[in-house]
Amino acid sequence: MLFRSGMKYRHYAPKAKLVIVEGDFDKFKSFVEKEKGLAAGKKIGLILTEENKGRIEADEVEYVGSRLSYEDIAHNLFAVLRRFDEKNIDVIYSESFDESELGMAIMNRLVKAAGYNIIKL
């Protein structure tokens, strides 16, 4: 299979709209809570790290791992996105990741899966 430039990780893309939200977690939470209020009737999913477990609710929350182990996050990302497909989620909001070393590879895959849909807070 041949990929056009920038499409290498498009196979990561979920069926749902994926939005990466950049900013500290309090801003992330405020943004998502507002969006949930505007998305009546839509199933909302969240991609979070273990550090934020229990800090926000949605129809479906998936944890990719701890920020202390980007290896785990990289390993879990694809499976997490597929689980959202299985649960018919409409919109997914994801935390962003530090773009140093392995974090850059994670963000590269996530950004392409999101179709470059990034909100900077």
Segments from the language model and where they lie:
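Short, flexible loop segments at boundaries between secondary-structure elements
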Residues: 118-121
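A C-terminal functional module that forms or caps the active site or interfaces directly
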Residues: 6-115
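Short, small-residue-biased leader/transition segments that mark boundaries at the very start
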Residues: 1-2
